[in-house]
């Protein structure tokens, strides 16, 4: 993990033995099998989006388990893959178009660079084994990242899609921040509350109202 302004708050909050256990978990799992994302991208979300620049937090579940697809950013998918994109990112693009934003590619790195923390609750996944690392090591860390963002003074937007992410609402101070909850953008649930929820325009409205620059979701 590269040193960022997330580092010290995390070390202050987590148990003293957490980081040695985390390093042991990473070393062991990456030696034993095919794990995604690449080891140098595990913490890419907090490396690309410092706490001081974080305006929006989108919570995902875990990385894509297929080779070459996970980028260390929730929902982001390499632009080099033009076909067979995950249905969730396709539906996110549909909602963006509905809200007047035109984003043709599925790589969300430019969002992260604008202050959108694309945080998976579980940061690693074995090949073709979605959610297999849930409950192993990551949730104490990612829950604290959410709490640190919530405790920060600047108002933020927390976007929680689906039942898994919505459970994180209890970690967030709703009196200070905007919490946007909706169905997950997967095909099973997108038509039951994701489409038409307008998370992107609502986020920008809140940012402008609180004196912050809006996100260019088309990037």
Curated annotation (Swiss-Prot):
One of its GO terms (cellular component) is cytoplasm. GO terms for biological process: base-excision repair, AP site formation via deaminated base removal. Gene3D superfamilies: Uracil-DNA glycosylase-like domain. The keyword Magnesium does not apply. It comes from the Bacteria. Pfam families: UDG. It is found in: Cytoplasm. Its EC number is 3.2.2.27. SMART domains: UDG, UreE_C. The active site is at 62 (proton acceptor). Keywords: Cytoplasm, DNA damage, DNA repair, Hydrolase. GO terms for molecular function: uracil DNA N-glycosylase activity. It is an enzyme of class 3 (hydrolase). Its main location: cytoplasm. It catalyses: Hydrolyzes single-stranded DNA or mismatched double-stranded DNA and polynucleotides, releasing free uracil. The keyword Amino-acid biosynthesis does not apply. NCBIfam families: PRK05254.1-1, PRK05254.1-2, PRK05254.1-5, ung. Belongs to the uracil-DNA glycosylase (UDG) superfamily. UNG family. Excises uracil residues from the DNA which can arise as a result of misincorporation of dUMP residues by DNA polymerase or due to deamination of cytosine. This is Uracil-DNA glycosylase. It comes from Lactococcus lactis subsp. cremoris (strain SK11). The gene is ung.
